[in-house]
Amino acid sequence: SELTIRNEKGKDFACIEDMDFQIGRVLEALKETGEYENTYIFFTSDHGIAIGKHGLMGKQNLYEHSWKIPFVVSGPEIKKNTEAKGNIYLLDVLPTLCEIAGITIPETVDGISFNKVLRGKKNKVRNVLYGAYSGGFKPGMRSIKKGNWKLIKYDVMDGAFTMPRKVQVNQLFNLNKNPNELLIEHQNEGVIAITKNIPKKNQINLAENPKYKSRLQKMEKLLFSEMEKVGDPFKFWNQKWVI
């Protein structure tokens, strides 16, 4: 309900305010000890919750509003007020810290150092970003992102506590033109009245559009490749088993 969403947003804003205060205390302590200019500061977070977006409340989804998280770094030789557009995983933080500290990166580490990205010597370290959600009644939710294109693939049970049904759906988005991953439902007059947002006609799921069949196939192939690469045991209805 609208009241629930307002309540959750209030909690969100309160958390942000307190977090800002606590970070300020840390920064002041560094300045008081004279270590501020000689310290690398990494700020990031856990995944957020939807709070009404896409009609969802939790974070059991792979949309950008829940999947994408803040990542801010400051420190010596890092240019202020700059932004890197590339992708990273949190597992890339360890090798990055090792490289900054002059420590040999362990061979067992799967991450990639983005130290050169921080220093403006490289634009990105990853072209592809893979995401998975495997909780509860929705074990088959996977996503792949490359450039402006993103595919979310579902093989899940919907309404598991009432009348469960199998849902096998693809969602294809051009994030450059549809950054909020809007669906056809967002063009409903009732939804527009609540959100006060009028989507453009092409801001929908493109997976069912024959014009984007080739793009869908390419993204699916890339997704399946990444699943095999990381050893993901789940298999979609149209995914071939590799023995």
Locate predicted features.
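Surface-exposed helix-capping loop/turn segments at secondary-structure junctions
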Residues: 25-38, 99-108, 212, 222-237
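Histidine-centered active-site microenvironments of extracellular/periplasmic hydrolases
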Residues: 28-79, 89
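Flexible glycine/proline-enriched surface loops and loop-helix/loop-strand junctions
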Residues: 4-8, 54, 75-81, 99-100, ...
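Conserved beta-strand positions that form and line the central face of beta-propeller blades
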Residues: 50, 62, 71, 83, ...
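C-terminal cap/loop subdomain of S1 sulfatases and analogous C-terminal strand-loop tails that border
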Residues: 47-53, 79, 91-94, 99-195, ...
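A long, amphipathic alpha-helix that forms part
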Residues: 1-39, 100, 214-215
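Long, internal low-complexity/basic segments
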Residues: 1-7, 15, 19, 137-140, ...
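Beta-strand elements within well-structured catalytic alpha/beta cores of enzymes
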Residues: 12, 16-19, 23, 40-45, ...
